[in-house]
Amino acid sequence: MLSVDYENFDLISYLYNLVRQIPDGMVSTYGDLAEALGDPVAARSVGFMLSINKEPDYIPCYKVVPHDGSVGNYTHPLGSAEKMRRLIRDGITITNGHISNFEKVRFREFKTDYPLRKLRELQFKIGRLYDDRNDYSLDTIAAFDVSYKETRGYASKVVYNKGKIGAYVYSSDSMFPYIPGYLAFKEFKFIRALYDNETMILIDGNGILHPRFAGLATHAGVSLKTASIGIAKHLINCTVKGSDLLISGVVAGKMIGHHTIVSPGNRINVEEAGRLIEQREGKEMRSLLRLAHNLTRLHIETNGNIARYDFSTRNTAIQSS
């Protein structure tokens, strides 16, 4: 379903190339750069990507300012004072911490392919491929969790198979930051790397409960051609009617209790996913996600050098993929 190019897309470098287009004597805003990436929702993520810029003399992030024309912060030992010095050096006038004639020196004419637009188009396609037939088996259940330390991603998979539990870990760099609605492009590559033909996969995230009906669990289930369920802890922007969660008038998820949000990823419908997770087997499935989360934290703490993990009564060897 997805090409390797999309799975490993380096959005950070793409942004840095946009920043390098800003001429001396001009500035752009975080929102301007988000628009150039293809979605204004990425503005906060633009700030994060600029904050980890390790080459400030090559990538002139001092030319990026808040939307109100204030100078703003600068990740430099001298802070905003150094940012003002560089802007003044470029010929920009600053008065009381704000750029004079802001709109006249504001640059928006980026040469861009709007990559986030293309990713949204792909999500619409994936959403349309969601299969709501209850075509699933619980023979092998895999729960996935991914966490990050700067741009390094640490993933874990806990598998339940015929009464036995296995655990696997994988780590890799991720050059795609968190952007609301685009989590799959940050995390799916980790799930693909660990996936081994399990018949049901559980994802810490949403399925069709997503603006384009293509959350991480749907992205993974459709791409891997397997059944999947998304289990999340935080509610996205949707309509709540009792236990039903609606996107654009369509029931796309269920609220189980006060803290569990369930949405089908693939090969299962909303009602069946909610029923399955609410019953006894579902509680056991949720425990697999908790184990995967704990394993991921340990994976990070050991900088990817984990050798063993004790599941209370089980001393389970970890296989690193």
UniProtKB/Swiss-Prot annotation:
<feature type="region of interest" description="Probable methylated-DNA--protein-cysteine methyltransferase">
    <location>
        <begin position="1"/>
        <end position="86"/>
    </location>
</feature>
<dbReference type="InterPro" id="IPR036388">
    <property type="entry name" value="WH-like_DNA-bd_sf"/>
</dbReference>
<keyword id="KW-0460">Magnesium</keyword>
<dbReference type="Pfam" id="PF04493">
    <property type="entry name" value="Endonuclease_5"/>
</dbReference>
<dbReference type="GO" id="GO:0032259">
    <property type="term" value="P:methylation"/>
</dbReference>
<comment type="function">
    <text>DNA repair enzyme involved in the repair of deaminated bases. Selectively cleaves double-stranded DNA at the second phosphodiester bond 3' to a deoxyinosine leaving behind the intact lesion on the nicked DNA.</text>
</comment>
<keyword id="KW-0227">DNA damage</keyword>
<keyword id="KW-0479">Metal-binding</keyword>
<protein>
    <recommendedName>
        <fullName>Bifunctional methyltransferase/endonuclease</fullName>
        <ecNumber>2.1.1.-</ecNumber>
        <ecNumber>3.1.21.7</ecNumber>
    </recommendedName>
</protein>
<feature type="region of interest" description="Endonuclease V">
    <location>
        <begin position="87"/>
        <end position="318"/>
    </location>
</feature>
<comment type="similarity">
    <text>In the C-terminal section; belongs to the endonuclease V family.</text>
</comment>
<dbReference type="GO" id="GO:0046872">
    <property type="term" value="F:metal ion binding"/>
</dbReference>
<keyword id="KW-0540">Nuclease</keyword>
<dbReference type="GO" id="GO:0003727">
    <property type="term" value="F:single-stranded RNA binding"/>
</dbReference>
<keyword id="KW-0511">Multifunctional enzyme</keyword>
<dbReference type="Pfam" id="PF01035">
    <property type="entry name" value="DNA_binding_1"/>
</dbReference>
<keyword id="KW-0378">Hydrolase</keyword>
<dbReference type="InterPro" id="IPR014048">
    <property type="entry name" value="MethylDNA_cys_MeTrfase_DNA-bd"/>
</dbReference>
<keyword id="KW-0234">DNA repair</keyword>
<keyword id="KW-0808">Transferase</keyword>
<dbReference type="GO" id="GO:0006281">
    <property type="term" value="P:DNA repair"/>
</dbReference>
<feature type="binding site">
    <location>
        <position position="145"/>
    </location>
    <ligand>
        <name>Mg(2+)</name>
    </ligand>
</feature>
<keyword id="KW-0963">Cytoplasm</keyword>
<keyword id="KW-0489">Methyltransferase</keyword>
<dbReference type="GO" id="GO:0008168">
    <property type="term" value="F:methyltransferase activity"/>
</dbReference>
<feature type="active site">
    <location>
        <position position="61"/>
    </location>
</feature>
<dbReference type="InterPro" id="IPR007581">
    <property type="entry name" value="Endonuclease-V"/>
</dbReference>
<dbReference type="GO" id="GO:0016891">
    <property type="term" value="F:RNA endonuclease activity, producing 5'-phosphomonoesters"/>
</dbReference>
<feature type="site" description="Interaction with target DNA">
    <location>
        <position position="178"/>
    </location>
</feature>
<keyword id="KW-0255">Endonuclease</keyword>
<dbReference type="GO" id="GO:0043737">
    <property type="term" value="F:deoxyribonuclease V activity"/>
</dbReference>
<dbReference type="InterPro" id="IPR036217">
    <property type="entry name" value="MethylDNA_cys_MeTrfase_DNAb"/>
</dbReference>
<dbReference type="GO" id="GO:0005737">
    <property type="term" value="C:cytoplasm"/>
</dbReference>
<comment type="similarity">
    <text>In the N-terminal section; belongs to the MGMT family.</text>
</comment>
<feature type="binding site">
    <location>
        <position position="204"/>
    </location>
    <ligand>
        <name>Mg(2+)</name>
    </ligand>
</feature>
